[in-house]
């Protein structure tokens, strides 16, 4: 008996089904680094149009977390896809290296008792160690970039250019010095920027306090009354009793309606909309009478006594007063609130600040001198009770500003700081706020809702406090007049001279500078060096100038900034403000893309206490970095990204589908040489031409839509669907018979391989931006060998086809696929009851509408191959219907079809006539399937 197994074209795949990624990826990385892949790519891409994604610098402190991994993976997918789209897309990774967290770590490791120069030296060393640690993990994720020459905000050149950016803003006229209330962290001992503030719930005392009116006759007149007997109070409500020693006024809303109410306590002034709730808090249900009503503008300039200090308190009108909660009257302490400051400034009230930088009251403050503001709260409540001016006291849980580093409550505190003014007219007569809002309009957002979010933040943000009272940071290199506080008239020129020194020696050049080196002897008598450093957000917000504008391979403005959604109030905003406030006069980016935060499968934040933290190091060590990359790409990053072991296992299934498809494709291309064996398109079997069209359409969707629009989850879904539906469940299922049973060098088989070659080459290029390791592994086989890279090539060029012919081809095979699905469904009951095993054991009689029947009949004898049955007949009817039955033919032991011609050819007793032709003669021909 003849063994026909050796006559079928079953080839071994050079692409194993098991990726073994976790073990193999590090070796690939080593090889790519040794081959200088990134540097070669820069040479190959030279002269192409540029695409610049500017890296938002992560902070150089601690191991990378899963959020870092998502961010870098998304950036890498974009860089790779843009490269394959024909752009020169260099990627320069960066790190944020100055600031308090590093100071804190150095203090923990080395203590505080050392010269400041040594302290800064240790900060620089610590930051460099952290950069090296994080860099290793980013590279392990497959992120392609200039890792040998990243940018660091502590590079001497970058520090110098950050100083130059300060000079730009100074020359533009937006920089000023002022004593304003700013968010102040008592643990940091410094002011904080907007982006350094986070909000958490806090329990605070909530109190109602009466301010006794001085002149009840004037109060009566304001309410249209002839007179008032007894005491009268303006009642305020506050959750910060500690600010009362700084209270300098009470604010009323000009259009708010107020009532004068007679109560057992005396006459109370309360907002009409809040009076009922307020009186309940005071326990007044009887003996109440509403005496009169008036509006807040009539109360303006009335005077009261402070509730426990000897201080005159005027009544002001403020736009910030609402009737959402409280009493409708607001105690106003300009040292401890921006709105308070603004309204007092309007009335010419000079700011009084009784709280020092340690959060303690100065010695002149009665009863609470030397106490912290938090310690003072109960003392102040006791004081109010003694004076009889405390109407109610309770506890309230509310959202409150906290330091993002220390997680401790912040206070507003007026300090002398340097600001970038939002509403100050610059040298060009325009305000920074107006420029920034215009810049938002000129920016493209992904997702689109980012526009409204950033615009609202810019519209509502205060002036940017850019000075810090720290040691490890880029210095504000100004010379300030000792008496007037004015900057030296030659500040612009002096800044540049200092920047040149910093470029050589780093920021220590400023701290060690003797002012006599740059100033005349006379100027030295009148000017001092400023000791403040800059907000770290100014450092990172200036990198578009210090990095993008300076590095030869980059172009300004950047095409894209991509960060987490919290950066609307962080890096996106600080970069926009420095861009708009400088001579560039615009945002330093054309597009902004934001991604959500990573949560667990239940939507909870990652937390060590919950035990749901998924570390990227654990993922790539267990599953491989390509699985982490596929997870990041397959998740809609516009919302939260859920991750867990179970989710990663599901992602692994998708990866396996792609990998198994590639393994099959490579097996059946292992004896195919595209130069010698390819079949011209016009001579290809029809279904092969159709499959190539499907692959080209997939490429058009990914290369023309999903990758350019950054919708990677659609790309992954489409790739997996193409592998499982178009290929696995349809084309490859049909193709196996032709690949395995026709003659190895026949046109029928070479046509199939030609289609597979186009499909495989395109598919490898399409997956490569996401599955960078798998893509390169596959390209080693189908590309130019180990020294070649998938990144050295642009999207696959498919053979062209007449548009009309293509449309007809797709229409025809779409109908055939529909018929095949109906046939498969009709056979299913026969398989379920074991009447047949495979579909080849069945025959099908198809009734179809005329057009579909025409398409099916056009395939003639080859219809059975397209439908995966041993026999198929077609007749015309009103709708699609299929009758399936078991074949009464005999099974061919070579092709497994059931036919009535097994043994019909002498010498081939166990195989069908077709197989006899393929084994011993010229072989069959195919036209359609």
UniProtKB/Swiss-Prot annotation:
<feature type="short sequence motif" description="'HIGH' region">
    <location>
        <begin position="58"/>
        <end position="68"/>
    </location>
</feature>
<keyword id="KW-0479">Metal-binding</keyword>
<feature type="binding site">
    <location>
        <position position="608"/>
    </location>
    <ligand>
        <name>ATP</name>
    </ligand>
</feature>
<dbReference type="GO" id="GO:0000049">
    <property type="term" value="F:tRNA binding"/>
</dbReference>
<dbReference type="InterPro" id="IPR033708">
    <property type="entry name" value="Anticodon_Ile_BEm"/>
</dbReference>
<dbReference type="GO" id="GO:0008270">
    <property type="term" value="F:zinc ion binding"/>
</dbReference>
<protein>
    <recommendedName>
        <fullName>Isoleucine--tRNA ligase</fullName>
        <ecNumber>6.1.1.5</ecNumber>
    </recommendedName>
</protein>
<dbReference type="InterPro" id="IPR023585">
    <property type="entry name" value="Ile-tRNA-ligase_type1"/>
</dbReference>
<keyword id="KW-0067">ATP-binding</keyword>
<comment type="similarity">
    <text>Belongs to the class-I aminoacyl-tRNA synthetase family. IleS type 1 subfamily.</text>
</comment>
<keyword id="KW-0862">Zinc</keyword>
<dbReference type="GO" id="GO:0005524">
    <property type="term" value="F:ATP binding"/>
</dbReference>
<keyword id="KW-0963">Cytoplasm</keyword>
<feature type="binding site">
    <location>
        <position position="892"/>
    </location>
    <ligand>
        <name>Zn(2+)</name>
    </ligand>
</feature>
<dbReference type="InterPro" id="IPR001412">
    <property type="entry name" value="aa-tRNA-synth_I_CS"/>
</dbReference>
<dbReference type="InterPro" id="IPR010663">
    <property type="entry name" value="Znf_FPG/IleRS"/>
</dbReference>
<comment type="function">
    <text>Catalyzes the attachment of isoleucine to tRNA(Ile). As IleRS can inadvertently accommodate and process structurally similar amino acids such as valine, to avoid such errors it has two additional distinct tRNA(Ile)-dependent editing activities. One activity is designated as 'pretransfer' editing and involves the hydrolysis of activated Val-AMP. The other activity is designated 'posttransfer' editing and involves deacylation of mischarged Val-tRNA(Ile).</text>
</comment>
<feature type="binding site">
    <location>
        <position position="895"/>
    </location>
    <ligand>
        <name>Zn(2+)</name>
    </ligand>
</feature>
<dbReference type="Pfam" id="PF06827">
    <property type="entry name" value="zf-FPG_IleRS"/>
</dbReference>
<keyword id="KW-0648">Protein biosynthesis</keyword>
<keyword id="KW-0436">Ligase</keyword>
<dbReference type="GO" id="GO:0005829">
    <property type="term" value="C:cytosol"/>
</dbReference>
<dbReference type="Pfam" id="PF00133">
    <property type="entry name" value="tRNA-synt_1"/>
</dbReference>
<dbReference type="GO" id="GO:0004822">
    <property type="term" value="F:isoleucine-tRNA ligase activity"/>
</dbReference>
<feature type="short sequence motif" description="'KMSKS' region">
    <location>
        <begin position="605"/>
        <end position="609"/>
    </location>
</feature>
<dbReference type="Pfam" id="PF08264">
    <property type="entry name" value="Anticodon_1"/>
</dbReference>
<dbReference type="InterPro" id="IPR050081">
    <property type="entry name" value="Ile-tRNA_ligase"/>
</dbReference>
<dbReference type="GO" id="GO:0002161">
    <property type="term" value="F:aminoacyl-tRNA deacylase activity"/>
</dbReference>
<feature type="binding site">
    <location>
        <position position="563"/>
    </location>
    <ligand>
        <name>L-isoleucyl-5'-AMP</name>
    </ligand>
</feature>
<keyword id="KW-0030">Aminoacyl-tRNA synthetase</keyword>
<feature type="binding site">
    <location>
        <position position="912"/>
    </location>
    <ligand>
        <name>Zn(2+)</name>
    </ligand>
</feature>
<dbReference type="GO" id="GO:0006428">
    <property type="term" value="P:isoleucyl-tRNA aminoacylation"/>
</dbReference>
<dbReference type="InterPro" id="IPR009080">
    <property type="entry name" value="tRNAsynth_Ia_anticodon-bd"/>
</dbReference>
<dbReference type="InterPro" id="IPR013155">
    <property type="entry name" value="M/V/L/I-tRNA-synth_anticd-bd"/>
</dbReference>
<comment type="subunit">
    <text>Monomer.</text>
</comment>
<dbReference type="InterPro" id="IPR002300">
    <property type="entry name" value="aa-tRNA-synth_Ia"/>
</dbReference>
<dbReference type="InterPro" id="IPR014729">
    <property type="entry name" value="Rossmann-like_a/b/a_fold"/>
</dbReference>
<keyword id="KW-0547">Nucleotide-binding</keyword>
<dbReference type="InterPro" id="IPR009008">
    <property type="entry name" value="Val/Leu/Ile-tRNA-synth_edit"/>
</dbReference>
<dbReference type="InterPro" id="IPR002301">
    <property type="entry name" value="Ile-tRNA-ligase"/>
</dbReference>
<feature type="binding site">
    <location>
        <position position="915"/>
    </location>
    <ligand>
        <name>Zn(2+)</name>
    </ligand>
</feature>
């Amino acid at each position: 008996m003849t063994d026909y197994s050796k006559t079928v074209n079953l080839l071994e795949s050079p692409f194993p089904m098991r990726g073994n990624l976790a073990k193999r990826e590090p070796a690939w990385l080593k090889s790519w680094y040794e081959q200088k892949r990134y540097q070669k790519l820069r040479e190959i891409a030279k002269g192409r149009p540029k695409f610049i994604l500017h890296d938002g610098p992560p902070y150089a402190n601690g191991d990378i977390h899963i959020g870092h991994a998502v961010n870098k993976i998304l950036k890498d997918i974009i860089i790779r896809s843009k490269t394959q789209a024909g752009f020169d897309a260099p990627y320069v990774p960066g790190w944020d290296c100055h600031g308090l967290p590093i100071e804190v770590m150095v203090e923990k490791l080395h203590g505080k008792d050392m010269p400041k120069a040594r302290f800064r030296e240790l900060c620089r060393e610590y930051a460099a160690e952290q950069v090296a640690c994080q860099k290793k993990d980013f590279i392990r994720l497959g992120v392609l970039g200039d890792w040998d020459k990243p940018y660091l905000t502590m590079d001497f050149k970058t520090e110098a250019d950050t100083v130059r950016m300060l000079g730009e803003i100074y020359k533009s006229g937006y920089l000023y010095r002022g004593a304003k209330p700013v968010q102040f962290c008592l643990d940091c001992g410094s002011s904080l920027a907007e982006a350094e503030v986070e909000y958490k719930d806090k329990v605070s005392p909530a109190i109602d306090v009466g301010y006794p009116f001085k002149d009840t006759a004037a109060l009566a007149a304001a309410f249209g009354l002839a007179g008032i007997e007894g005491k009268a109070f303006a009642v305020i409500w506050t959750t910060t009793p500690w600010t009362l020693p700084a209270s300098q006024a009470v604010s009323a809303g000009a259009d708010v309606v107020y009532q004068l109410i007679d109560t057992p306590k005396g006459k109370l002034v309360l907002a009409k909309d809040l009076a009922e709730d307020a009186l309940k808090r005071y326990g007044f249900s009887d003996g109440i009478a509403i005496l009169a009503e008036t509006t807040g503008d009539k109360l303006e300039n009335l005077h009261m006594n402070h509730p426990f200090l000897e201080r005159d308190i005027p009544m002001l009108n403020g736009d910030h007063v609402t009737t959402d909660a409280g009493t409708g009257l607001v105690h106003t302490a300009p040292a401890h609130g921006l709105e308070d400051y603004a309204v007092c400034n309007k009335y010419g009230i000079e700011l009084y600040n009784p709280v020092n930088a340690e959060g303690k009251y100065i010695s002149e403050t009665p009863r609470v001198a030397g106490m912290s503001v938090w310690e003072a709260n109960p003392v102040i409540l006791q004081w109010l009770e003694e004076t009889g001016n405390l109407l109610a006291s309770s506890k309230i849980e509310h959202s409150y500003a906290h330091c993002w580093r220390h997680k401790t409550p912040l206070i507003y505190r007026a300090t002398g700081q340097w600001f970038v003014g939002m509403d100050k007219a610059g040298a060009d007569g325009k305000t920074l706020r107006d420029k920034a809002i215009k810049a938002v309009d000129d920016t493209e957002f992904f997702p689109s809702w980012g526009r409204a979010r950033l615009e609202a933040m810019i519209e509502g943000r205060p002036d940017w406090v850019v000075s810090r009272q720290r040691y490890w940071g880029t210095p504000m290199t100004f010379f300030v007049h000792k008496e007037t506080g004015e900057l030296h008239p030659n500040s612009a020129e002096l800044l540049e001279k200092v920047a040149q020194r910093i470029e050589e020696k780093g920021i220590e050049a400023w701290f060690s500078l003797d002012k006599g080196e740059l100033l005349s002897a006379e100027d030295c008598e009148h000017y001092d060096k400023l000791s403040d450093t800059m907000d770290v957000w100014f450092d990172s917000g200036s990198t578009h100038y210090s990095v993008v504008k300076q590095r030869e391979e980059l172009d300004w403005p950047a095409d894209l900034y991509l960060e987490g959604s919290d950066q609307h109030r962080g890096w996106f905003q600080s970069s926009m403000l420095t861009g708009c406030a400088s001579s560039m006069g615009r945002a330093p980016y054309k597009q902004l893309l934001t991604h959500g935060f990573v949560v667990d499968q239940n939507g909870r934040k990652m937390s060590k206490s919950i035990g749901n933290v998924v570390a990227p190091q654990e993922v790539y060590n267990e599953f491989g970095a390509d699985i982490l990359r596929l997870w990041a790409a397959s998740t809609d990053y516009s919302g939260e990204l859920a991750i867990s072991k179970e989710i990663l296992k599901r992602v692994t299934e998708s990866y396996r589908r792609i990998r198994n498809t590639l393994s099959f494709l490579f097996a059946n291309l292992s004896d195919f040489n595209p130069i010698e064996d390819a079949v011209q398109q016009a001579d290809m079997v029809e279904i092969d031409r159709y499959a190539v069209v499907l692959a080209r359409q997939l490429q058009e969707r990914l290369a023309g839509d999903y990758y350019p629009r950054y919708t990677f989850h659609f790309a992954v879904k489409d790739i997996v669907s193409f592998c499982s539906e178009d290929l696995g469940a349809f084309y490859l299922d049909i193709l196996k018979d032709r690949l395995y049973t026709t003659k190895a060098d026949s046109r029928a088989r070479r046509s199939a391989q030609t289609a597979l070659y186009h499909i495989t080459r395109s598919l490898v290029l399409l997956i490569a931006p996401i599955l960078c390791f798998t893509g390169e592994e596959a390209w080693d086989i189908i590309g130019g060998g180990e020294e070649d890279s998938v990144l050295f090539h642009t999207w696959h060029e498919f053979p062209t086809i007449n548009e009309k012919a293509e449309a007809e081809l797709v229409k025809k095979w779409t109908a055939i696929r529909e018929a095949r699905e109906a046939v498969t469904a009709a056979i299913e009951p026969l398989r379920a009851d074991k009447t047949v095993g495979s579909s080849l054991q069945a025959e099908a009689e198809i009734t179809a509408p005329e057009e579909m029947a025409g398409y099916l009949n056009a395939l003639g004898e080859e219809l059975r191959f397209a439908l995966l049955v041993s026999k198929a007949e077609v007749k015309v009817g009103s709708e699609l219907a299929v009758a399936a039955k078991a074949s009464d033919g005999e099974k061919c032991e070579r092709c497994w079809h059931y036919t009535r011609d097994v043994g019909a050819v002498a010498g081939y007793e166990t195989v069908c006539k077709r197989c006899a032709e393929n084994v011993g003669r010229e072989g069959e021909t195919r036209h359609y399937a």
